[in-house]
A protein has these predicted regions:
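Short beta-strand His + acidic residue motifs that chelate non-heme Fe in jelly-roll/DSBH
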Residues: 320-322, 340-341, 357, 363-369, ...
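Conserved N-terminal catalytic core of the sugar/cofactor nucleotidyltransferase
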Residues: 1-7, 15-22, 30, 34-108, ...
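Catalytic core of tubulin tyrosine ligase-like
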Residues: 144, 153-287
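A short glycine-rich, His/Asp/Glu-containing loop-to-beta-strand
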Residues: 287-328
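Double-stranded beta-helix
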Residues: 364-400
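Short acidic-glycine-tyrosine-enriched beta hairpin
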Residues: 313, 342-363
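Glycine- and acidic-residue-biased ligand/ion/polar-headgroup-sensing regions
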Residues: 326-344
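Conserved beta-loop-beta/alpha segment of the NTase-like Rossmann-fold superfamily
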Residues: 73-159, 200-206
Length: 400
């Protein structure tokens, strides 16, 4: 039997756009002729997959249809959530729609993940499909590349040929993350591999109320062509919990599929800056290089309400002490040891460390060293022009 991919596409992207009204959900951000949702849709075009199901909300329907047309996916089903109830009800409702066989393997994917070496991903899916049962759940783990507090972790023990999950740790501190990596812990990617009957059995056992009302929401849904409009009155009676809290924390039959591949959920501007730093050779154009007394900057990519730059600060180069009215900035240090000023605070940052400059914050970058400093900068705001600079001090005489 083929595997049915279910793409969870209801996230709002507020982690990237805090306190901003006019933001774009992460899965739809155009990073230069590609989006994260587009990458996900391309990922499920293999012959091992059946037509996808997309779980989303009314707000994103138009954008999702646009993506489906662009990526030439003609067979699909869309399940529209009438209210935001977290991933537990979303996963269950998507599983309960008709035409899905009771024992159908379902692969739950986030719409906003980047993944390389996908052949390994496909190989592991096919390898573990035979172990799916009407009770167990397989989660995908990513081998950590660093001790991050941005992800949940899990630990496993070997049981026959399968890695059984014995403990979950939700977004630990960096020191605890280091100890988890030493114990061969993996990042919890948020992707699941499970049969339909296992989802039903687990929700009946651990979240009976949610099961009852999601089932009613599906039965009473309006089914127009390939879109299911879930019944709001029933759906909102389900318990608004994530799938992790609703089921994973309660069931004992959880197994792991461990992946050692480049992966990111681009959940922060630091991760986005890393992505652009990795691919900057393909983005640099002479017309986008601008020279300043302190060094130079290169505009790598301009998106909706954001701009990605690389700053090159020469030895002893000092940017002006300045602030912006219309933008905030995220800096990722990729080379050197810059001295940073944020209002009255002064500190030094190392490679791979980041700095957030809130709109209106007086700030400065200095390079007191003999080697150059390189920083990937993400500017976020309604106005991203060089005119949005108020200078207080400048060794090059640019204060007006």
């Amino acid at each position: 039997m083929k595997i049915r991919p279910v793409i969870l596409c209801g996230g709002s992207g507020t982690r990237l756009w805090p306190n901003q009204k006019n933001y774009q959900a992460k899965q739809f951000i155009n990073f230069g002729n590609w989006t994260l949702l587009g990458k996900t849709l391309e990922r499920i075009k293999k012959k091992i997959f059946d037509a996808p199901i997309i779980s989303t909300n009314y707000k994103y329907l138009k954008e999702i249809k646009k993506h489906l047309r662009k990526h030439k996916i003609k067979k699909y089903k869309i399940v529209l959530e009438p209210a935001k109830m977290n991933t537990g009800p979303a996963i269950l409702a998507s599983s309960l729609i008709k035409d899905i066989p009771y024992s159908q393997p379902l692969l739950f994917l986030s719409a906003d993940h980047l993944m390389e070496r996908q052949n390994i991903f496909y190989k592991e899916i096919k390898r573990y499909q035979k172990y799916l049962s009407d009770k167990n759940i397989f989660i995908f783990g990513i081998k950590p590349t660093m001790p991050s507090s941005e992800f949940g972790y899990f630990l496993t023990k070997k049981k026959k040929k399968i890695d059984q999950v014995i403990k979950f740790i939700e977004k630990p501190s960096k020191s605890i993350a280091k100890s988890l990596i030493a114990k061969k812990g993996y990042w919890n990617s948020g992707m699941f591999f499970i049969r339909k009957n296992s989802i039903i059995n687990n929700f009946k056992k651990h979240q009976l109320t949610t099961y009852k009302y999601c089932q009613k929401a599906v039965l009473k849904s309006k089914h127009i062509k390939n879109i299911y409009y879930l019944d709001k009155n029933e759906f909102i009676k389900s318990t608004p919990k994530s799938f992790d809290h609703a089921v994973l924390e309660k069931t004992k039959e959880i197994n792991a599929i461990k992946l050692n591949i480049p992966w990111s959920d681009l959940g922060s501007w630091q991760e986005i800056c890393k992505m652009f730093d990795k691919n900057k050779k393909n983005l640099i154009k002479k017309k986008n290089i601008f020279y300043r007394p302190w060094g130079r900057y290169i505009n790598l990519f301009s998106g909706k309400n954001f701009l990605i730059k690389e700053l090159y600060v020469k030895p002893n180069g000092i940017l002006s002490l300045q602030k912006h009215f219309h933008r905030s900035e995220h800096w990722l240090i990729t080379q050197g040891l810059p001295k940073i000023t944020l209002n009255k605070k002064k500190f030094t940052k190392k490679i791979n460390e980041s700095v957030f400059v809130q709109k209106g914050t007086i700030h400065r970058i200095e390079n007191p060293n003999k080697k150059p400093v390189k920083i990937i900068e993400a500017q976020l705001g309604s106005i991203l022009k060089e005119t949005d600079i108020v200078r207080y001090q400048d060794i090059y005489g640019r204060v007006k």
